[in-house]
């Protein structure tokens, strides 16, 4: 007989042992289940469990925190893509960076496709590894923009770097652009740009062809320093002259360009582009290349997907260009002819409207306005007439009142060309500050609009100015797409405090302020801006001409936003980059590597 006291002790011991065994078994089961969920081997793993165990039903684990974050990111990205489709190019442009951030060189749509792949994958370790591998391969493909053109291979990787030297022989000066490209991708990726400019332009040398050619030497020295010596013999160099040399006449301009080609071929190691490599560039090419430059740097062209593009307005010294991609309504028919430009870039085709208005660059516009002022008073003035050779360094002896000069300001020794080889030199004086009908630029705006010749016959309606056909920007260009104005448009707004984004009406107000004179400048502008205005007495005329061209000439509404910049991502705007890209196609670039004489 067991003592009741001993019996209770035995029962208590058995109970404790049972409880301990239960907890030990539960903990072991929990560890096994956790290991099964987290470390479940793939089907092709050498450690696959026995079939019976593998067949046991296992509930799929809940989505991981990483998946939730990816799904949230995907939803946010889809929302952003929806907004981007509505606003086309996003927020206002800062002046030095693209208006939206691109991911791995592609549009956000590609990233969304990649995230969709990740979101729909199962939480199997092997599948996750495959997804990560696929995403890595896709990201690599995205960086290349399109299928890479592997020109030279090193351990299976393309590392081709090529250079282009482009010289812009403009009307007021010459500029060199030395571009460095990664040519392993299509379109080529711009890595860096070296830029230098000097004055005067080639056209100022007139018949001194040797002097004109040698004037480019400082620019070519920049190229020699930038391009590695082992690359120089296979680096193309081109010299493209614009309106200034075009206005010099065919005989004189050809003599200068022939001497430039000879100088490059004899004295420099670069591969000189044949045929039109050293030439006067056609105005339509100048505008289209400027359009390519801007939209290439903005990321609008070059990818597989066709994106909305920006309109481009370029203002040089001798001519101005307009280029945009019209979107015609159903009831509108594009006009064939010289204004229509069709070409292919990357995987997409573009049909552009373009026109180069020769004689309507800023310096030519100045001269046209000053012509009107002087012609009205020429009969009552005793002025000496000069030829183009004689006018250099000539001093004025007569003052002429000009409504395009601010009150109290004098533009000294202004050369006015009235006809072929007919020049006069005068001092242009601003009106009295008491004359409210003149001060403020109203009369100057009238003169600026008059030189645009809006009353000229328009044979193919609608027209912009001087009888030139132009599709309506209001009807055929999306109101949310960007309009970029650069070169002299930038040079006459940025130095006096204008932001990188402004309306035509704000430009008109700025023009009025500048024409009112220094008394008003000091109340509104910073000291540096006032200093800049004092250094250029014809700033009022320039702004009046620019405003008239954009609003009255091109018919851009007053409320329309414009964007201006000198560079995008530290790369110069203008036609040079657009003209350099085709030279990288070694099969069709019209140049061959030179034999390196140092070898």
Swiss-Prot record:
Membrane topology according to the record: Single-pass type II membrane protein
Chain segments carrying region Disordered: 41-105, 117-155
E.C. code: 3.6.1.42
CDD domains, A to Z: ASKHA_NBD_GDA1
Catalytic reactions of this protein: GDP + H2O = GMP + phosphate + H(+)
Pfam family, one: GDA1_CD39
Parts of the chain on the Lumenal side: 25-599
Location of the protein in the cell: Golgi apparatus membrane
GO BP, sorted A to Z: cell growth mode switching, budding to filamentous; cellular response to neutral pH; filamentous growth; filamentous growth of a population of unicellular organisms in response to neutral pH; fungal-type cell wall biogenesis; nucleoside diphosphate catabolic process; protein glycosylation; protein N-linked glycosylation
Function: After transfer of sugars to endogenous macromolecular acceptors, the enzyme converts nucleoside diphosphates to nucleoside monophosphates which in turn exit the Golgi lumen in a coupled antiporter reaction, allowing entry of additional nucleotide sugar from the cytosol. Has a role in cell wall morphogenesis during the transition of budding growth into hyphal growth, a process known as dimorphism.
Family: Belongs to the GDA1/CD39 NTPase family.
Name of this protein: Guanosine-diphosphatase
Originating species: Candida albicans (strain SC5314 / ATCC MYA-2876) (Yeast)
Encoding gene per record: GDA1
